[in-house]
A protein has these predicted regions:
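Helix-biased detector of long, well-ordered alpha-helical tracts
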Residues: 1-200
Length: 200
């Protein structure tokens, strides 16, 4: 899709304005890392703290449309996985994969998204956390926020924030990537061993 097509839908393909807005912010203790890493919250100089936020984005609209077509609330469960893995994959790019703490935010239009849908999103978090635990990725759900923002949101927004401590010696710092290094990329489509169905 062309840049103009994105812009006509209210989406910035480059986010130049956002980059300009944050240009004077601290880059953290590893400025070249994929995510911002800051001083360790516990004050240990051998550790740092990773915090990352992302969400399911426009997949919320797809889940809502599928629910409206089928009447099946289970479509909302997948938003938890979409929101969570947008964070786990980014933190994994920094080498941060252990003992993650999760907080989430669900913003909804209560005229369209009822408590049953919210319950399914939360159930989805419980399910994906259990599946990831079976793969050695331990995440503790620490609660979150559910906001009724019908004046801002047409259906719902599902966002997650992950926090973890990491040993500085184990951080993957993208600033250290050099010519000749091998970068392995994994396709995001298909079906992982912990998934119930094909994932696009």
């Amino acid at each position: 899709m062309s840049a103009e097509s994105y812009l006509s839908r209210g989406v910035s393909p480059t986010k130049d304005d956002v980059k300009a807005a944050v240009k004077n912010q601290s880059k953290g203790v590893f400025p070249g890392a994929f995510c911002k890493l800051i001083e360790d919250l516990a004050g240990d100089p051998e550790y740092c703290t990773a915090i990352h936020a992302d969400g399911a984005g426009t997949k919320s609209s797809v889940a809502y449309l599928m629910y409206k077509e089928t009447g099946n609330y289970d479509w909302f469960k997948g938003l938890a996985q979409d929101s969570l893995v947008m964070n786990t994959d980014d933190l994994a790019c920094c080498g941060v994969t252990e003992d993650l703490m999760l907080s989430n935010t669900i913003g909804r239009n209560a005229h369209r998204v009822d408590g049953k849908a919210i319950a399914k999103v939360i159930e989805g978090y419980d399910e994906i956390i259990g599946k990831l635990a079976s793969q050695g990725i331990n995440i503790t759900m620490c609660g979150g926020e559910t906001a009724d923002v019908g004046d801002l949101v047409r259906t719902l927004i599902v966002d997650s924030t992950l926090v973890a401590r990491a040993k500085r010696s184990e951080v993957i710092n993208a600033a250290n990537i050099k010519p000749g290094n091998v970068i392995v990329g994994l396709a995001s489509f298909g079906q992982a061993t912990y998934e119930d169905r094909y994932n696009s």
